[in-house]
């Protein structure tokens, strides 16, 4: 029975990603606000414990004589330290220091310091090193002002020591604050061979904090491969975040990861380079072994082959799928690419969740793939009777599980944070512009990558500003009021209750707080306006510069309190969506009016305009675009979000050729001819709408699939005409009414010339099935499109 309970837990426990997540790990840890208690602060010595003891080392606070002052003067070899102890392992991302001001009487400050840290898994204190392998960190130039230093890599510590140093002997006093967050992951350490040197450049894992001992093998610590930082392009120049190995005699690199608890692992993600022109390809294959105790490894081994990519040299995440393996230790062997002299890795993450070990006895064998049960026969037959009961209970539970999974297929709850993007990219060039092929296993899961959400513009904005449509993703729950949107539909519906299903008031009304997120508050003076992009549903949309990136800024002003509430709900819902093929909300400005929503800027504008400006686009590019959109829509599907207005005009293209799902209030004015005006009140995209959405007001992921079928037709038609271009709006409505009454359309969109017959018949046509349950899921559409990416040059028409 415990094994059954265990199986239940494995089946329904959502996967999380074991990774060092730094985007929201910069909180003040409590020196200034006294969340860190006096008893958690200690020091090697104090000039006077009462007036300059460690309890006075709080930044932005004046107590005692104003700071901690060690008993001895400081030089470059000093060993004085201030120690902060935490109750749990903690991620430290930055340190702030001040001197002793003491209302102007102080004269002492530290010009530099070092960091030492410890946690229970380490045998000794470790020293922090920056990207240049230096331990010394610059500190203060006066006694009053605080200086905050961001660490080049985060450290994981239970105790941290601030060690003041100086080139000349001097008296020093310090106040400090530390920033970071609790360490919630379960990785204890990883073991790996030390990296190699190339022409004096080190590709060592120099931040590794375990047992070094001048050995070529690193054990018992954590370093670059688990610091939340991924490497940049051109590993031979931007080498600081990479660990690199030359091809050895055996041609592989071995890694071992140990967790503090049993984990149910479903995937391993490895960030690797692929600079094949410099003989630094991604790994060609991988082998993974698992153990529940670190000693005995399962005979069931995971083998993974990574297809060689000779098109793109961009670093990428590669996902190794693992079929729910229970393990405390995972050993990974990566084989060098063909004719590759180097292998570079910058980060390793795990898709996994906690396994409740209390359900497992020592004598319960956790199955690798097939479980074998044996029963010892007793004279009284009791054991056989128990076995029969157990067997039938197992069958009943299995049927229940399968039934629930089937029912949850269409009505999934909002997914947990998806895993980092495991995409492969194949660059396709169209008259100097670039679109990316994305080929990724289980892309619908991979929202977190995004991983660093890098949104830096790489191409100048088109001079035709009307081509840019405001990102405003319209999403809505399946649970909608089934009210017809047109007059003349039978049923007891109050016509006064008809409302625009594309408005923010309606489309976000079904989302409770569970779907919302708290977005970063961005200082208004950080935004430098570049130009006006256009007009959105709530106000103007401007192109602005935010530090080193360009962003699209939506303004809200001069509207009702209800619209302001809708705007707040919209941006909070949108902020919860994180996927490489969904336009991202960067932050908000809400402290002053007008309220601003800062969104990712997509410099190549909407997909329809982009395709129209590139008439030489080929079938392979069309398949790539559809694959990317299907990935984003599969993610929305997994979150149970409904878009309601999927069309080429509502997708955007960034400077690198990434195509992303969006929905623009502005698109309805840019492409007003593609919308049908209902009673002079609102407009509907009837040529993209499923029959049940238009006639019954039923919006679901299945109605989105219908719209995506029309969108694929658009893409393969090169957006040269609108759907059903030979029909009036009334004819289109009549066509959908025909499906409602007869189960079939009078007229179906014909296969575009550039669309392969197989794709049209097997992927596009099924999107327009009368029964929504017979339409494919976005997950299945995405998987089928991915399979075509590899064969697109050989597709027959």
Swiss-Prot record:
Keywords: ATP-binding, Cell membrane, Cell projection, Disulfide bond, Glycoprotein, Kinase, Membrane, Neurogenesis, Nucleotide-binding, Receptor, Repeat, Signal, Transferase, Transmembrane, Transmembrane helix, Tyrosine-protein kinase. Expressed in some neurons in head and tail, some motoneurons in ventral nerve cord, in PVP interneurons, seam cells, rectal gland cells, vulva cells and some non-neuronal cells in the tail. Expressed in D-type motor neurons. The record marks 100 as: May be required for collagen binding. GO terms for molecular function: ATP binding; collagen binding; protein tyrosine kinase activity; protein tyrosine kinase collagen receptor activity. Changing residue 141 to A: Loss of N-glycosylation. Impairs axon regeneration following axon injury. No effect on axon localization and kinase activity. ATP binds at residues 533-541, 554. Residues 20-384 are extracellular. The active site is at 645 (proton acceptor). The chain crosses the membrane at residues 385-405. Its EC number is 2.7.10.1. Residues 406-797 are cytoplasmic. It comes from the Eukaryota. GO terms for cellular component: axon; perikaryon; plasma membrane; receptor complex. Residues 527-785 form the Protein kinase domain. It is found in: Cell membrane; Cell projection, Axon; Perikaryon. It is a single-pass type I membrane protein. Autophosphorylated on tyrosine residues. N-glycosylation at Asn-141 is required for axon regeneration after injury but is dispensable for kinase activity and axon localization. Residues 1-19 form the signal peptide. Belongs to the protein kinase superfamily. Tyr protein kinase family. Insulin receptor subfamily. Interacts with shc-1. This is Discoidin domain-containing receptor tyrosine kinase B. The lineage of its organism: Eukaryota, Metazoa, Ecdysozoa, Nematoda, Chromadorea.
